[in-house]
Design a protein with these regions (language model features):
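Acidic, divalent-metal-coordinating active-site segment for phosphoryl/phosphodiester hydrolysis
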Residues: 152-163
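Short secondary-structure boundary/hinge segments and terminal tails
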Residues: 72, 156-157, 235
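Short, glycine/acidic-enriched loop or turn micro-motifs at the edges of active sites
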Residues: 12-14, 121, 157
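Conserved non-catalytic scaffold segment of RNase H-like nuclease domains
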Residues: 1-115, 128-149, 175, 186-189
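Nuclease catalytic cores that cleave nucleic-acid phosphodiester bonds
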Residues: 125
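Acidic two-metal-ion nuclease catalytic site recognized across multiple nuclease folds
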Residues: 161-249
């Protein structure tokens, strides 16, 4: 059984790693089944923070303006993760955002890969009768203290949830699904699996785009809620198109 891993949780501006950004990273390092270290950082995303995300997480635009940028935090997070197995609740969500940010900063090594453990996947297999398998609801079901929608709190709760699920279903074979499996089958279900997410590095904003965007911002007296210098080529194109649509050419 896996006793050494790092639990990861990311808060983001939305659900799509292609367009959205990380605003908070939380990670918990586990060795021999015990938490030995923690990582938590807000991240300045360089784009506007949707109001619904503030309502969900309690994180404000003002806090993020004071936070470190992705170019500082992502290298620190990768160092913390090392080559560990990554535990998450819907682990591919967090892994996809992490890898996109790392690839765009040329931080992802060609040979780099991780195995993953997913408490959402396990709960779907062993707790099909529950009306919801969101992390908050599973924590309520098992009496686990939980600070919802903050990265470190979610990561810590995921560690506790994984421990409970492993003991209840893998070790003790409780419940209908587990009772129908052999010990070997249960251990295989709880074994880490390869995390595979393919992404290409996005090109940075072109000088012509930068010049055009600064000109449009000045012309229409727009105060940007993003960092022009850190935009990708695609992001700059979408913003320029949006300005043209709003103000005309």
């Amino acid at each position: 059984m896996i006793e050494n891993y790092t639990a990861l949780d990311l808060e983001t501006t939305g659900l799509n790693p292609k367009y959205d950004k990380i605003i908070e990273a939380g990670a918990v390092k586990v060795r021999n089944g015990e938490i030995i270290d923690r990582f938590q950082q807000l991240i300045r995303p360089g784009i506007a923070l949707p109001e619904k995300i503030t309502g969900l997480t309690g994180i404000t635009q003002e806090e993020l303006l004071e936070a470190k940028g992705s170019e500082t935090v992502i290298p620190q997070l990768l160092d913390f993760l090392e080559d560990d197995v990554i535990l998450g609740h819907s682990v591919m969500f967090d892994y996809s955002f992490l890898k996109k940010a790392a690839v765009n900063q040329n931080l992802w090594r060609p040979e780099q890969s991780h195995l993953g453990l997913d408490t959402l996947r396990l709960s779907r297999i062993y707790l099909p009768e529950l009306p919801s398998r969101r992390l908050a609801d599973l924590c309520l079901h098992y009496g686990i203290r939980h600070q919802a929608h903050r990265a470190l709190g979610d990561a810590e709760s995921t560690v506790q949830l994984y421990s409970v699920l492993r003991k209840e279903f893998c070790e003790n074979a409780l419940g209908e699904a587990a009772s129908k499996q052999t010990r070997e089958e249960r251990e295989k279900t709880f074994a880490p699996f390869p995390l595979i997410y393919k992404i290409k590095r996005e090109s940075p904003i072109r000088p012509q785009q930068k010049q055009k965007l600064y000109s449009l911002l000045e012309q229409h007296k727009i105060i940007p809620d993003y960092d022009v210098e850190k935009l990708t080529r695609n992001e700059a194109s979408r913003i320029i198109d949006r300005i043209y649509f709003t103000y005309g050419r």
